[in-house]
Design a protein with these regions (language model features):
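Reductase modules of NAD(P)H-dependent flavoproteins
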Residues: 20-126
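Active-site beta-strand/loop microenvironment that shapes enzyme catalytic pockets
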Residues: 1-18
Length: 126
């Protein structure tokens, strides 16, 4: 699951599924009480990993940076019939799709369009 800003909302309910391994990557401008609440919710779930980037912090980090850092997790997801869900801004979606395309090419996977057609990369962006 990849989100920025309010795009995290749909994923919060999905965190309750205990039987499925989940990876949540999210980006916000600043660390706030709300982002701390999201962090606490995610960290208290079983089978859930969490990575957060803050784009306006002293050491800015964007969601695409987090995805790049965990390239092999995304390769594993795509190779093993997993699903990548993206929710948030259209700009973030474009950046993430570019990042995933590079990961697919580098690791000799199918194209991102293939995974989208197969329902393995899902987007709900605005």
């Amino acid at each position: 699951m990849i989100a920025n800003g309010t795009g995290i909302a749909p994923f919060l309910g999905m965190l309750d599924f205990k039987d499925t391994e989940k990876h949540l990557y999210c980006g916000f401008r600043h660390q706030t009480e709300a982002t701390n609440n999201f962090t606490n919710i995610a960290r208290n779930q079983i089978n859930t990993s969490l990575k957060i980037g803050y784009s306006r912090s002293e050491m800015p980090k964007y969601v695409m940076d987090l995805v790049n850092e965990d390239e092999l997790i995304f390769v594993d997801i795509l190779q093993n019939n997993g699903v990548i869900m993206i929710c948030g801004s259209l700009r973030m979606q474009k950046d993430i799709e570019t990042t995933l395309s590079k990961i697919c090419e580098k690791n000799k996977l199918n194209s991102i369009d293939f995974y989208k057609k197969e329902g393995k990369i899902l987007t709900d962006c605005y």
